[in-house]
Amino acid sequence: MHSKDMDFVQMFVCFLLCWTGVDAVFNLKYTVEEELRAGTKIANVTADAKVAGFALGNRQPYLRVISNSEPRWVNLSPAGLLITKQKIDRDAVCRQTPKCFISLEVMSNSMEICVIKIEIIDVNDNAPRFPTNHIDIEISENAAPGTRFPLEGASDPDSGSNGIQTYTITPNDIFGLEIKTRGDGSKIAELVVEKTLDRETQSRYTFELTAEDGGDPPKSGTVQLNIKVIDSNDNNPVFDEPVYTVNVLENSPINTLVIDLNATDPDEGTNGEVVYSFINFVSNLTKQMFKIDPKTGVITVNGVLDHEELHIHEIDVQAKDLGPNSIPAHCKVIVNVIDINDNAPEIKLLSENSEMVEVSENAPLGYVIALVRVSDNDSGANGKVQCRLQGNVPFRLNEFESFSTLLVDGRLDREQRDMYNLTILAEDSGYPPLRSSKSFAVKVTDENDNPPYFTKPHYQAMVLENNVPGAFLLAVSARDPDLGMNGTVSYEIIKSEVRGMSVESYVTVNSNGEIYGVRAFNHEDTRTFEFKVSAKDGGDPPLTSNATVRIVVLDVNDNTPVMTTPPLVNGTAEVSIPKNAGVGYLVTQIKADDYDEGENGRLTYSISEGDMAYFEIDQINGEVRTTKTFGENAKPSYQITVVAHDHGQTSLSASAYIVIYLSPDLNAQEQIGPVNLSLIFIIALGSIAVILFVTMIFVAVKCKRDNKEIRTYNCRVAEYSYGNQKKSSKKKKLSKNDIRLVPRDVEETDKMNVVSCSSLTSSLNYFDYHQQTLPLGCRRSESTFLNVENQNSRNAAPNHGYHHTFTGQGPQQPDLIINGMPLPETENYSIDSSYVNSRAHLIKSTSTFKDMEGNSLKDSGHEESDQTDSEHDVQRGHYADTAVNDVLNMTVPSNNSQIPDQDQSEGFHCQDECRILGHSDRCWMPRVPIPARAKSPEHGRNVIALSIEATTVDVPHYEDCGTTKRTFATFGKDGPDEDRAEQRGRRQTAEPAVCSPKTNGAVREAGNGREAVSPITSPVHLKSPQSKASSTYNTLKCRDAERIANHSLLRQPEGKDSEPAMREINTLLQDGRDKESPGSKRLKDIVL
């Protein structure tokens, strides 16, 4: 509170003391910060009064505030609590006083007075604030450095150190800031000019002025300080040049620009505003011919210039600013008046409207649009004028003596261009020539030359069925580029029929091309229809064009399903089923029709009510079937309600009430369900597939059997040799008689007889000691003579394949025969000393012979080998037995040897089983007598030599040795041996090929003989031949070869074990080396 208020309080307190006679007066002082919210407790006066000696007596204390001193900021309760009434704002209570107090006087019930003073402590809750957002100061550029300009200060309601303490300005070199303190303690700022100002260099400055208080933390406020430098008239106007020279044509029109003068003054305002004027001593003629604009300095022609009167004008001009003490600037302008052809041609358009002429777009070429007249007041050549049209336009000028005509010179089309701006240029013959121009417009008027055209040739609209008659369907649009009535288009529907009715009964079109439906469409009746719309303009005659409109009527779910099966009577159908019907029994099938399409017509069936526990329905096909059996206590009838509803967006449905009677007379087994065509179709396809599969298997088996017969029954020698083997396990020792020399008295002395058979092949497979049969290479055997080969031919290429070629050696080199058969040489088994002396090599070697199926050697009468036959023995002698004991006994007889014929009624090989089961092929094989051993001196040289050679070539092809299919089951049963021999002879005469591999390879010369090298083959690759045999082979009849082979087989009926045989062979070979006989010498050569 102010001091005056405090004095009044003290005086009032003294008055109370004197008037009431109080006992004592006490003082209490409190200090609080401003901005306390209402209801804040300041102190407990009762407690503080006791401390201060304020005796309240023994009575209950009671305090009251004297009414004249009650403040509006605080409140004292009777119990002595001092509380704020409202938020205390020191700045509102005490303004700018250094200290702020509020006081109140309190009287107790003991008549004692207490004076309470509350000091309000200032809080820095206000930031300095400037009265405006910017401060503008104008300073003359003549202001000297050190000049001060007071600035408007900021205000801060806070006091003391929380008030404004300082001002700052944006740092710069031109102005500074000085802070001063007033008498009331407030701070003010003064702007100080520190450097000379130049407005022409910089006319404005902008800084930021900041006021900051002393609070903690301090608060601040800012304002923008704008300083404008005021100009002073310290510059004079200056012209660009002191003298200007210009040329002006005579008869130049008034206001023709002569020159634009420019004098600059860098001062501002009136100090820089320049005015122009002629100097007072300029002649009056010059002032009449020319004038100058005081503000712009533009000199223009003010009269008629005539070169003949005065051809030079000198004009003196001055320029000065409007500032005080202005100093003017001067310049001189020299004007030369140029003599010229000063009369230009004049052009006039002789038409009703000199600015525009009209022409129809159908105007023909040469059509006259307007007349043009051109004149020139000059005489002579200066008055002779030529005219032309400017630009590329479909017009031309036709010039005559005194006028010209404007003609159409091209096709006009208003739709392309409806207006032409023409300019006629006229030029006289003066020097320089004068030109003039005349511009006018040519408007092309419209003709009805364009028919309307639709924006597209086909329109389509989709509308839902059951539309409201008169509903908008679509709009067609046609355009006509013509104007007026020629471009006004009207529409109409071309007459046609839709389902036998006029199309106008379906749709209509208005003048704007909007098509509306006349009737409600039905998708089920009319799904789509087309019609044509004609667009016609208003020309005379009118032009038309057409467009096709297609209306597609979309389906709406507007058809309720209709029950068709079973037949309903008043919505009810009765069905009878057997009482003993089981689960899944077909009661009936519900069928309904819906004429809608898609989802609107797809129906689903369901049972909505009734005896649903006993029946169920297929949602798709509507079959009603039982779900449980009916017992003895079943009702006589059951009822269900079947509903068929479609799948439209708003589903429609139909229901049927089905009464199902249980009849004991019907039998549940008599039901024949509906035919499932899909199942029948699948079963039929499966049956066809099975039949085809079985047929393929049958054909494959038959082909395999035929191939087996072709591969198996082709060499009779092997067939006879195997047939003479006995089941006896008794082994016969090899004697010297088993090795014999073959006499040389055969048909040709330089050839030897070799049984050619595809079974004499070399295989890279390991030797199978459990194979029981000898596979034969062809169905009949033939003997082939080979030319004698020189000894040097033994150095042939090594074996690289499966097949070998047998070649003869020289006549002086006998070969080794074991049991009538030459010992073969394979790629793993060679006839040399190491192999002969090594048992292990012989056992591990691979033979050129392959066992044939033993089952095929015995016929049980069932046309094929029967493995259950008594002759079938899987433990029969091994291939080595046949190869060493039986096959080696086959020798080549001389020409004088006779082979006796066998009994035709019963063969030599017949057994008791033949009388019961029938004869087999082996029964008809003739018995060949054992030939006498040759004692000729040359016996040692005439032997069969087998030389194993191989050449790596393509797989050979075997030729079928007979056209008649032969097996062991049919051999000897299709005719006598003589007939078969004749047939074979005829075949061999016409076809001299052999069964051995075809010699597609080269035939190499070697000494006096020739070596036929056969291609490599494998027993498993038997193909048809590609070429005939080499001429090196001479073929014998198979019958002769069979007799020779059989003759040897009869001498050795039993098999021979390979190991004992080889031991005996080694012994014999050792004996032969000691004697050095020709035969042993030949054997040594073979072995080496």
From Swiss-Prot:
Q: Give the organism the record lists.
A: Danio rerio (Zebrafish)
Annotated binding of Ca(2+) 13, by residue? E465, N522, E524, D558, N559
| The keyword Cell membrane is assigned to this record | yes
Annotated Ca(2+) 3 binding sites = N124, N126, D156, D158, N162, D213
Q: What happens when the gene is disrupted?
A: Disruption of the columnar arrangement of neurons in the optic tectum and defective visually guided behaviors. Increased spontaneous firing activity in the larval optic tectum. Morpholino knockdown results in aberrant early brain morphogenesis due to disrupted cell convergence in the anterior neural plate with mutants showing an abnormally wide neural plate. Mutants show impaired directedness of cell movements and impaired coherence of movements among neighboring cells.
Q: Any signal peptide, and if so, which residues?
A: 1-24
- UniProt: Ca(2+) 5 binding residues: E141, E200, D231, S232, D234, D267
Q: What high-level taxonomic lineage is stated for the organism?
A: Eukaryota, Metazoa, Chordata, Craniata, Vertebrata
Q: Which residues bind Ca(2+) 12?
A: N448, N450, D480, D482, N486, D537
The principal location of this protein is membrane
Task: List the Extracellular topological domains.
Answer: 25-678
Residues binding Ca(2+) 15, per UniProt? N557, N559, D594, D596, N600, D646
Coiled-coil intervals, chain numbering = none
One BP annotation, GO = brain morphogenesis
Residues recorded as binding Ca(2+) 2, renumbered to this chain, are E34, D91, D122, V123, D125, D158
The protein here is known as: Protocadherin-19
Chain positions recorded as Ca(2+) 14 binding sites: E465, E524, D555, V556, D558, D596
Question: Which cysteines link up through disulfide bonds?
Answer: C94-C100
UniProtKB keywords: Calcium, Cell adhesion, Cell membrane, Disulfide bond, Glycoprotein, Membrane, Metal-binding, Neurogenesis, Repeat, Signal, Transmembrane, Transmembrane helix
Q: Where does Ca(2+) 6 bind?
A: N233, N235, D265, D267, N271
Q: Where is the composition biased (Basic and acidic residues)?
A: 859-875, 1071-1088
Mutation: D122N; reported impact is:
Does not affect interaction with cdh2 or adhesion activity
